């Protein structure tokens, strides 16, 4: 078992998150395959060494959703990092127990492709289903420990929604 003092000494994992809006202004969410399987989330993923946040965002978008960079436009990004803590029971299960949570740079993207451009059956699938929802509904569908992140993302992008 990991002690609270040990958790506090762990770093945050650098990560990007993507709010992808369709032509109707709805946000893309997908249902996780593993641990909180009933949870829906927006695409997100780690930043590889030597990669900047924008490059990571576009790479993760394609890896997780099949959406290619020629089908999106970046509209905005968060000014700073938004952090969240993992629940203690997940720390040892994710990323070899090396991180206490994640610090995320979020990007708002406009998707101008068609729904058939989306393919979650990727090389390393993370999702079992996807849908478009109203941005205001995002905090209701995410796991509780990420809810504050989604509220902060909505606030950061409110002028563009």
Predicted features along the sequence, with ranges:
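Acidic, metal-coordinating catalytic segment for phosphate/diphosphate chemistry
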Residues: 1-21, 96-97
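Entry beta-strands of beta-propeller and related beta-repeat scaffolds
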Residues: 26-27
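Residue-level signal for short, function-critical loop segments
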Residues: 33, 46
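A conserved beta-turn-beta hairpin within the catalytic core of GNAT-like acetyltransferases
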Residues: 35-38
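A short gly/proline-enriched turn/hairpin at secondary-structure junctions
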Residues: 41-43
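Unchanged
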Residues: 47-144
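Charged phosphate-binding loop/patch that engages nucleotide di/tri-phosphates or the phosphate backbone
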Residues: 135-161
């Amino acid at each position: 078992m990991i002690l609270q003092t040990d958790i506090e000494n762990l770093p945050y994992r650098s990560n990007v998150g993507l709010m992808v809006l369709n032509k109707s202004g709805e946000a893309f969410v997908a249902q996780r395959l593993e641990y909180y399987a009933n949870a829906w989330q927006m695409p997100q993923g780690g930043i590889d060494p030597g990669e900047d946040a924008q490059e990571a965002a576009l790479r993760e978008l394609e890896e997780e959703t099949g959406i290619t960079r020629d089908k999106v436009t970046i509209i905005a990004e968060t000014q700073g990092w938004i952090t969240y803590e993992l629940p203690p029971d997940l720390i040892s299960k994710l990323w070899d127990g090396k991180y206490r949570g994640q610090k995320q740079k979020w990007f708002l993207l406009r998707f101008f492709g068609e729904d058939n451009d989306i393919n979650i059956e990727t090389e390393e699938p993370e999702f079992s289903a996807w849908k478009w929802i109203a941005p205001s509904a995002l905090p209701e569908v995410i796991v509780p420990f990420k809810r504050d992140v989604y509220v902060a993302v909505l606030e950061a992008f409110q002028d563009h929604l």
